Amino acid sequence: MTVDAAKLSTEFCTVTPEALTAVRDSQGKYFASLMKVDPDKFAADTLDPRKAEDMANVLEEYTSLKGKKVLEIGTGCGVNHIVWQKKYDIEAWGLEPEGEGFENSTDVARKLIRANRLDPLRVKDAVGEAIPFPDNSFDIVYSSNVLEHVINPAKVLREAVRVLKPGGTLQIVCPNYLSYFDGHHAAFHPPIISNRFFRWWIKWIYRRDPAFAATIRTEINPLWARRQLKEISYSTPLTVLSLGEEKFIERMDQADVSQWMALGILGRLVSFLRRLGINRFLARLIVVLRGWTPLIITATKNT
């Protein structure tokens, strides 16, 4: 392991060498052939507490985390769960079933949470389609890069709204498959019209195994999101705050693209477009074409 766990750690999360090794040797090696990312970098990016703070900053543009009761759908390796408890004093709960490419995530999360002297049993082995909590339980329901991996994303959205308190905030971050880049495969692509087409693109254009692509819910896009939220609103009124287009424009204007995982290639492209002076125009054109990514589905449950 070339990554120093002590240097990766922050005051809000102690990253252990054991966690780094476990992620590198499982998820890191699994995704190395898909993303073309070194397993050590994958492990470091997965467990970097600074990423959890970046996510919190986006969420806090809509609501304060301080002291809130928060459910994270897809806790992953537990870093958000730890950082948000220690930095924002939240009451944190999480769901983390293990799936394709992520078989040891629950075990890593619980061990890391325990190493940070927090309660590992707050992370439940459960799926977003059947959230094991009563109605109106949480101030915030949050998820990042999970919705595209579930069996029934529409049901996950309905369940997330169900357990959200009136006045609470929902934020779901996920890829937009009307966009032009897939981070799971570090692949540029035209807007995806079907999973079959996506598998074909990954197999024949990028010459990679399409097995993981077959698990992706490529129907997720802004049109799908607005339709689902509208249907939910018939029974549970919601106010949709954003689908992330403003954040996309801001990042494109500033050439502020994360270097996490395989996003470095995208960041270099955006920097090049900025040097050409066309990044601002292109950002707004992409939004008109509904191709921004990621989707940042943010809504409040009306009181």
Regions found by a protein language model. Give the residues of each.
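Helix-to-beta-strand junctions that scaffold the AdoMet/dcAdoMet cofactor pocket
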Residues: 150-151, 164-166
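S-adenosyl-L-methionine-dependent methyltransferase catalytic module, highlighting the catalytic core
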Residues: 154-155, 169-298
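A short beta-strand submotif of the Rossmann-like class I SAM-dependent methyltransferase core
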Residues: 143-146
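Conserved class I S-adenosyl-L-methionine
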Residues: 68-76
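A short acidic, Gly/Pro-enriched loop at the edge of an enzyme's catalytic core
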Residues: 129-140
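Class I SAM-dependent methyltransferase SAM/SAH-binding core
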Residues: 79-130
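Conserved alpha-helix/loop element of class I SAM-dependent methyltransferases that forms part
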Residues: 48-67
